[in-house]
Amino acid sequence: MNVMVKKEWIEKGYVDEPVDEALDLKAEIRKLCKEKDAIILAHYYTVGEIQDIADFVGDSLALARKAAETDAQLMVMCGVHFMAETCKLLSPDKIVICPDLNAGCSLADSCKAEDLKKYKEEHPGYKVVSYVNTTAAVKALTDCVVTSGNAKKVIDSFPQDEKIIFGPDYNLGNYINSITGRNMLLWNGGCHVHEKFSVEAIVKLKQKHPEAVVMAHLECKAPVLAVADVKGSTATMLHYAQEHPEIKEYIIATEAGILHELERNCPNVIFYPVPPEVSEGGVGCSCNECEYMKMNTLKKIYNALKFGWPTVEVAPEIAKKAVKPIEKML
């Protein structure tokens, strides 16, 4: 795809071109997808209007599987940058677009490739298991990749006495250690959204809604997971709610974007999002949202499809190594 990329786009990280306010963006996006043989992949944490126009909505594991099997020539990954990298690794011959290159991830940022390389050298004989929320460069240093949906299954596949470095999500690794009896070395990284959930906030909601079932993502801290009735990935939460129609109330400790899919699939159920902890004297948004996921907008998706940019590439020498642990996971 030959694209004339403007300097100002590169500086901003996305295509910033005016769009007629009278334009039906949802309809135009679907039209462009048809013209360009494109599909839109969206994570559960994106805003509802993006999930509504997506060809496929899922968690990291489901999105990776979809990227590996699609016949479409172009993928628009509405999530964060590492997800777009994963799409490119699994479908190197396809065009992968990330609507805003600024859509990073605090968890991925907590583990730099050069730091992991040094840590590996300090711990010879250890296998490296990396959470999918990592850059391609980190995956290239990894023996196997996991998601919150399959972490236990993957770790169980290793001999019990295998020496393992697990990262970058400390909370997920700590939980897996606790239920498997292992003693993996844990990288001290975390998701800035899930780190802010507290037991106190859950208890307050539980007092107001005593019949509500508490569901928490595995990226939450150990005390939060300890009071949760259901622990798992976003897909785990969604499936649980669908499979238990007798339950009419849930308390949800994860990014608020999942509420759209939960409410769409379970219209007769009430979901209460857990508010995050705000430090004393803190200012700003007291919301359980990932600002990176919310960088994806209809306007950016429309412009990205129209102009064919920003595309995501992975250096061949990194891609060759990084794709192996992902394929092993799948």
Placement of each model-derived feature along the sequence:
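Active-site loop-to-helix "anion-binding N-cap" substructures in soluble metabolic enzymes
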Residues: 1-252, 258-259, 264-330
